[in-house]
Amino acid sequence: MFTMKKSLLFLFFLGTISLSLCEQERGADEDDGGEEVKRGIFSLFKAGAKFFGKNLLKEAGKAGAEHLACKAANQC
């Protein structure tokens, strides 16, 4: 009886350690997935800022050039 209890306790111990290792790996995989999402959101934000910045500077450049042409021709 004592031998059977020992072996059952040993199997329970091995199963617990195995389950613990699986949970740690699963947690590490979930953490890596979160980083990818963060990078994805950051790159999306970066691309949007670049697009709006480029268009905004282009429009500001046009307005500035028109204003300078107006001043040069004294038509303002």
From Swiss-Prot:
InterPro entries recorded for this chain?
Frog_antimicrobial_propeptide
A GO BP entry = defense response to Gram-negative bacterium
Main site of residence?
A: secreted
Subcellular location per the Swiss-Prot or TrEMBL entry: Secreted
Covalent S-S links between cysteines: C70-C76
Signal peptide (residue range):
1-22
Keywords attached to this Swiss-Prot or TrEMBL record, sorted alphabetically, are:
Amphibian defense peptide, Antibiotic, Antimicrobial, Cleavage on pair of basic residues, Cytolysis, Disulfide bond, Hemolysis, Secreted, Signal
Tissue expression notes: Expressed by the skin glands.
Q: Which GO terms describe its cellular component?
A: extracellular region
Residue ranges listed under propeptide: 23-37
Functionally, this protein is described as follows: Antimicrobial peptide. Active against some Gram-negative and a variety of Gram-positive bacterial strains. Not active against fungi. Shows very weak hemolytic activity against human erythrocytes.
Family of this protein: Belongs to the frog skin active peptide (FSAP) family. Esculentin subfamily.
Q: What name is this protein filed under?
A: Esculentin-2SN1
Q: Which organism is it from?
A: Sylvirana spinulosa (Fine-spined frog)
